[in-house]
Amino acid sequence: MEELLTKYPDIKVKAKARNLSKKEEAQEFGHWLLNNAYNIDVLVNNAGNFIPGSIYNEAEGALEAMIQTNLYSAYHLTRVLLPAMMKRKSGHIFNMCSIASLQAYNNGGAYSISKFALNGFSSNLRQELKPYNIKVTTVFPGAAYTDSWSESGIDPKRIMEAGDIAAMIYAASQLSPQACVEEIVLRPQLGDL
């Protein structure tokens, strides 16, 4: 946050740390936003968790942990914020899925299952919210360089920059009210890892 305030000294930034994998904290965060008189124009559901493993041998509780973070966080936060968006008949929701939402891969067991579920949530939400002029975009990024890759040995130039994904979300959010990018698929130029 310090970096944002330094880079953009004229903006007002408020932050509230919450563990969105917990239903009560996700709901409380949504109410905090609404109680601070924020009109949510764009919601990016980006809470995520990855625990590698195969379905047959991953740690006990891995599926539950990833469903809690990767699906339920978006579900519970969105449900709190939707009534105000529906009343205004405007808004744009971005759900951060993954290439793992579209195809299975080795060592992706529970993670892939949770992201497939988030894709289903996103598709249903898009259908339900059309009458309210609320757009829903599902984002399917491949590998993007974040801190979690810093000790992986992977050359940062081999995978996407996180800013590439942010730029696509911003671009999609700037379209006219009549246009909705339903899905964004982004992959490293050299292909998936």
Task: Go through each PLM region and give its residues.
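The beta1-alpha1 cofactor-binding region of Rossmann-like NAD(H)/NADP(H)-dependent oxidoreductases
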Residues: 17-28, 60
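Conserved NAD(P)H cofactor-binding loop of Rossmann-fold oxidoreductase domains
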Residues: 46-51
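Substrate-binding pocket helix/loop in short-chain dehydrogenase/reductase
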Residues: 54-55, 62-67
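Active-site loop immediately N-terminal to the catalytic Tyr-X3-Lys motif
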Residues: 56, 105-109
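Active-site helix of classical SDR
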Residues: 78, 114
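Residue(s) in the substrate-gating loop at a strand-loop-helix junction
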Residues: 98
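C-terminal helical subdomain
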Residues: 131-134, 138, 154-193
